[in-house]
Structure formats: C-alpha cells, structure tokens
Amino acid sequence: KFSRNLVDKFNMKINIAYGRINYIKKFSISDSLFECKGNINLLEEYPLLFFDCSIISEDNQKLLKKFSIKIKNKAEILNLKVSGNLNILNKKINLKKININESYVASNEDLKYFKNVFENTIFDESFLKIFSLEKIKEFILEVS
C-alpha cells in the first residue's frame, strides 16, 4: 500500500504561448526534492514533451520506503539527473542522458535498456497511467 500523503510540497509554473507549453515542476517527497522542466509544442503533428529532471535525496531509503520498496544497503545520498523526450501519441521515450551521483553516466546500451523497461512497464497504457504509483514502483524494482 502507498501512503496517501506521498507528496509533501508541490509547485508548478506553466507558460502557454503560440501552441507551446513551457513548464517547471518542483515537489518533495520525504525531504527528497524533485524538479522537472521542459516544453512541448502542441502544434506539431507528433508533439514531443522534452524534459530535464532531477531528484536530490539525502536518504534514498526514506524515499524508497514511500514507494513500499525496502533496500538492504545503508541510507545514501541520491543525485539523479535524467533528460530526454516523450512521444505521447506513439508512447515512446527517448533518453538523452542519465547521471547518478556524478559517478555513473549511462552508456548508450544502458539508455536503450532503460527506454525498453520504461516503455514496457510504465508507458504500456495511456499517457496518464505513467503517473501511477504502482507502475513507478514496478519500474524502480525492474531497473534496480
């Protein structure tokens, strides 16, 4: 079961002009800070949602516990950065880069693996289903 009070704080800024949406979204879960910024041009035939996201957590155990995931390792700092784009109509993701704690940079092979896992676990239904906590948990378990 998931906690009903998953998100502690939430802030979103949206700018809409000439068919383009620019956004900045910031929220926190268990003292972990999430930030995503990007844009989408809705006038394109196949609109792409570009994103540049980060998660900064002083205690990865505390964060994962919110998703009902237990890890045996000691609590560690997590600094995750991900950028890429989503093709909402075709349910595809393209990952440009993934960095973890400045010590791991995903190779092209790793990016393909994460893309396949994302599309097969999270993006296998409608766009709105990618925000399902159960699907996020499934993705985390698959890639860890």
Predicted regions and their residues:
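Small-residue helix/turn framework positions
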Residues: 1-143
